[in-house]
Amino acid sequence: MVSVSGIRKVQRAEGPATVLAIGTANPPNCVDQSTYADYYFRVTNGEHMTDLKKKFQRICERTQIKNRHMYLTEEILKENPNMCAYKAPSLDAREDMMIREVPRVGKEAATKAIKEWGQPMSKITHLIFCTTSGVALPGVDYELIVLLGLDPSVKRYMMYHQGCFAGGTVLRLAKDLAENNKDARVLIVCSENTAVTFRGPNETDMDSLVGQALFADGAAAIIIGSDPVPEVENPIFEIVSTDQQLVPNSHGAIGGLLREVGLTFYLNKSVPDIISQNINGALSKAFDPLGISDYNSIFWIAHLGGRAILDQVEQKVNLKPEKMKATRDVLSNYGNMSSACVFFIMDLMRKKSLETGLKTTGEGLDWGVLFGFGPGLTIETVVLRSMAI
């Protein structure tokens, strides 16, 4: 008689979950951060708020962002004037945009990842779709299956309103799926759209104004699987371990509420301090079992929540400036795309490692960390092992 343990062994993969392909995409509309304050106050009919506009210009400059991609154009905003007000009923219009655009850009990223992977779509067994933008029944995961033509037997996991830490969350779930289901191939798609949060300025709401200077649109797709087929699948990173922690005494630091006016959010000024004060604990928990205590000896893929967060993490951990180069490059060229950010960084890192002749996908190093920070305050920590190039 076959034992339960024997059945369980057959059902599971032998090796660790591995990143097999990465694809990214953005809406075609690209905005110049240096002129965004002028544009933003003009399209929202706020040019009379001269002092607030000057303050917003300084906020834009401090972000160290050069460009961002956004679905919303001036033409779209003219057709939807309530979205330009500070708080006017506009959820219907926002939802109509997002349930269309979120899966569309997600499809573009997924198509690139599938092309790099080089295997038939019929081999995809699971789909994880993550977005903070738009809610529908059936979800945008269903819409993506239709757009791509995936097999209807694909097992779907739809994750809404996770926020900026979710790049780590989807890897944690994908790791469990890939390692506990033999031959599983998990397609992850994170697609974010600022149509859910765009609104006009108000001098009493600086949190919203900071968000208008920071957030952007983008999608990333990753294919995860264990036991890559030799000479057929090309491993990029192995997912060694994952962890999620709610930071004590951080309630109210980051959050949001979906209302008739769209998604409203709050960003406490203490967020950079909270993250930096807890970063060493997260690193120690992840890397002590590996005997690693020098965090300059690993590569870094950190969610680019903002310049202040990156600066304080660098200072707290005594990181060399170059450790955050990939993260800061993505921040500069794309802005904060919430859950998708870490995969843009991962993609850039492996490409730059190849271009510069380094020996591994992780800037020539063997071990690395992927961090996500977001509502809760929540910290996701993922330990990665790079692959030889």
UniProtKB/Swiss-Prot annotation:
It catalyses: 4-coumaroyl-CoA + 3 malonyl-CoA + 3 H(+) = trans-resveratrol + 4 CO2 + 4 CoA. It is found in: Cytoplasm. Its EC number is 2.3.1.95. GO terms for cellular component: cytoplasm. The keyword DNA-binding does not apply. It comes from the Eukaryota. Keywords: Acyltransferase, Cytoplasm, Stress response, Transferase. Induction: By stress. Experimentally, by yeast extract and elicitor from P.megasperma. GO terms for molecular function: trihydroxystilbene synthase activity. SUPFAM superfamilies: Thiolase-like (SSF53901). GO terms for biological process: polyketide biosynthetic process. Its main location: cytoplasm. The active site is at C164. The keyword Transferase applies. Pathway: Phytoalexin biosynthesis; 3,4',5-trihydroxystilbene biosynthesis; 3,4',5-trihydroxystilbene from trans-4-coumarate: step 2/2. Substrate binds at K55, F56, Q57, R58, L267, G305, G306, R307. Belongs to the thiolase-like superfamily. Chalcone/stilbene synthases family. PANTHER family: CHALCONE SYNTHASE 7 (PTHR11877:SF62), HYDROXYMETHYLGLUTARYL-COA SYNTHASE (PTHR11877). Homodimer. This is Stilbene synthase 1.
